[in-house]
Amino acid sequence: MSDKILFRSGEATVFAKPGQFTDAMPEILIGDVSGPVGQAFANMMGQTAGHTRMFAIRACNQMVKPATMMVPKVTIKNSKMIELFGGVVQAGTADAIVDCLIENILPRDQANNLCIISLVWIDPQTLTDPNLDLKDMYRTNYEATKLAVTRAMRNEPSVEELIAKRHTMKHEMYDPAA
């Protein structure tokens, strides 16, 4: 059996194709069910108005392993957002987790002892976009989830990388030097 994984974190952003609001920005925690991530996972089983949590499932009766709890970063206000969260976003998230097992990014021998918390973003503009591309929304959530899990399991970025890029990389939404 591989070493026990106590606490890993990762994030990724995958941008939508032009003209879409389907950017995906999951933030991931991975850890053993007996540790702090497991405790947080158990505490999230209760529901909060507007922030419904869901297990990542591939299809009915096919919950992924490690057990993965999806939590929206935005308030779920209507049935369309529920459909996106529990449909295309859930499918992309679930498929990414299973593919991480297939590709040995997540250790198969710990699949029943790990849990994952995935904070997911759904841009409210998707609700009124008449040209919403669900395939692009699936793609961005799949790719971003897989990348976030990979980064978590590889402890990326390293401290050295963060220090080296401190003054060369800028936040996409705010540049204090501008």
Language-model regions: role of each:
Residues 1-178:
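Accessory interaction regions appended to the cores of large information-processing enzymes
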